Amino acid sequence: MDAAEELFARRGVEGVSVRSVNTAAGLAAASVHYHFGDKDGLLEQVIARRGGAVVARQAELLAALEAAGDRPDPESAVRVLAEPLFELLRREPVGGARWITIVANLVAGDDERVYRIGFGPGSVQERINATVAAAFPLQAPDVVAERWLMASTSLLQLIADSADRLSADDEATARAAFDVIVGFVAHGLDGVCRA
């Protein structure tokens, strides 16, 4: 899976063939098909490998935010989505950066394959969407949803593009860079949802 993750991050999912994954991993020609069925099965496992922990952490942060009982502010909602990504980069700089790049590219391309984990009725992502909508009670929910999609897509891309700085050895510098990204996205979301 490491070879697939590296290729998907570098070339994009559509730019990678099953054959190139087998070759990069030093495997027999039918290995990916045997273990994963096809490229989509492999991609699903690549996403799930790190995605399960990310979604679980988002659920923890969301539960804490919901337990507070106050109407959420945009920055708190953005942090629920973003903080687990920052933690992933701190824990696994190379693999985390690759994973975030893959997810960011799939989300930006509106590729349904990324939505197989953490999405659907009652999912963490659906609850985050509801939290964002609650932050803007005077705005139509469909307008908030559209603007949150733009903001969250931008957030993923900014984190992916800043992975080297966010995984730097100096925690304080990395945290400061992360806080700028979160603040930028939160203020942008606030601006377009209050308009």
What name fits each language-model region?
Residues 122-195:
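C-terminal peripheral helix-coil segments that are non-catalytic and often amphipathic
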Residues 7-49:
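Helix-turn-helix
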Residues 76-79, 95-101, 110-136, 145-146:
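Amphipathic alpha-helical packing segments from all-alpha helical-bundle domains
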Residues 3-10, 57-64, 102, 106, ...:
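Solvent-exposed, amphipathic alpha-helical segments
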Residues 81, 85, 100-107, 151-155, ...:
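Short alpha-helical scaffolding segments that buttress acidic/His motifs in well-ordered protein cores
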Residues 59-97:
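Hydrophobic alpha-helical connector segments
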Residues 1, 55, 75-82, 148, ...:
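Short, amphipathic alpha-helical "lid/cap" segments that border enzyme active or binding sites
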Residues 1-5, 21-22, 46-61:
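Generic hydrophobic, amphipathic alpha-helix propensity
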